[in-house]
Amino acid sequence: AQSVISELAPEAPADSPQEVGQNANLAAASEEALREEIARREAAEFASAAESLRQAMQSMPELAELSKQLIIDQTPEGLRIQLVDQEGRSMFDNNSVQPNARAQLLLRAVSRVINQLPNRISITGHTSAQPGSNRATLPNDWPLSSARANASRLILQSAGVDADRVYQVSGKAGSDPLYPDDPDLPANRRISIVLLREGGTWEHCQQSPEPVSRQECAATHANPL
């Protein structure tokens, strides 16, 4: 009798196509709201970390002058901390892969901020582009920039940064100058350290109905701190 009753029991009505669409829209809206909240919190944490680094630099006499060689901003990829050369104040001796004493001080200061956050990090080395060569670089600049990035990684790890957090170490030689209109400017020689976003702006840019390059995304969302 039980089986007869269950056979005769009316089936629950299936959701109409309109209801299915509404449920999908609600789920998508909820997911988008969550992504936006994660991005908002992450941006606030990055801003706090950047301010913490600036204060630390100013409070330590041996670092205060070096603060001019730090550029900190938020990009689609994350919180970017760049250690740049200045005229007469290089981070590496000529053709050397080892950061000099000045660079090591800065890297150890940066490590304290990195250790405040859980994000993975990427480290990129850059050399100067040759003047008049349309951003071409000397052949040995590729391994040189990579080796400098790796040497910087080792110093960060010796200062307490967990090796498991290092997502990428690379060298771009002079192919990505900080100042494209002045490729021989000392500041183009730099180490770029990025605390990567976990729910980032780049992923949001990729969902745009129009194709968006990383450069276009960066130009739209870059946020100097």
List where the protein language model places each region:
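Juxtamembrane linker/hinge segments adjacent to a transmembrane helix in small membrane proteins
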Residues: 1-79, 85-87, 202, 206-224
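Periplasmic OmpA-like peptidoglycan-binding domain that tethers envelope proteins to the cell wall
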Residues: 40-52, 82-84, 91-104, 117, ...
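Short beta-alpha junctions and helix-cap segments that line functional grooves
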Residues: 67-69, 110, 178-182
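Alpha-helical metal-binding/catalytic segments enriched in His/Glu/Asp
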Residues: 113
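Catalytic cores of peptidoglycan-degrading enzymes
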Residues: 120
